[in-house]
Amino acid sequence: MKRLLIVLGALLAPLPAHAQQVGANEAPTVLVTGANRGLGLAWAQKYAERGWNVIATARQPAQASELQELAARTGRLQIELLDATDPESVDELAKRLAGQPIDVLVNNVGMLGDEPEQRLGTLEPDRFDTYMRVNALSALLVSERLLPNLRAGQQKKIVGISARVASFAAYPRIHSGLYYYKASKVALNMVLRNLALDLEKDGIVVVTLSPGVVNTYGTPDNHDAMSPEMRASMTDIDSSVAGMIKVVDGLTMEGSGRWYRFDGQQIEW
């Protein structure tokens, strides 16, 4: 009898944290756009390591070697072709994902571009249009087309990645220049604010997140292009994304329509 009780106790003991992974069919699902590198790759990696089902999009999946390695290693990652600025590509993704609940949508696609082309005297209307499509329109298209998936999800959360330089309240501390980038991120902020208003009735939380100044493919290598404040506030990708995921975990309808830093601090518009 004593031996039987010991065996039963071992069977009923709680599993260690790393072993409490739910099955793929029971786990929540996150979709991350622009997940082939930088912040997007970090979002995908951290959610996969948490046991979530991850749908990671890239414009050229065959060349997304780090995503492929992550998929093979975790068994939790599905790579999908997507050009988030192309309505047809977004529609095709929505068709492929029809009936798939999505708990969290991370609109990560974005571009900072080259600082010299965004100065007075060098501006080109076509380039401005490109930045607007990448940094603002993409989030609107993807969020709209995937609304059925988000409504079917349990958590119902949409996030977009903006930047402190798009805050009017941050002036005059923000440096000049970067006309395309700043204007397009301001547009993204309004897209997300409008989505928050429209989707409140569906119980979908929509927020803007700022990763801080991180060393990614979107950050200029030339630190002279940054203000002293930006240089002093630089953080690493892992800390930034871990912080943003913590913010996402704690989101409720009360916080919908707001803008948060990766450390949870609210940013004024």
Residue ranges, per PLM feature:
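Rossmann-fold cofactor-recognition segment
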Residues: 71-88
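C-terminal helical subdomain
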Residues: 201, 208, 220-269
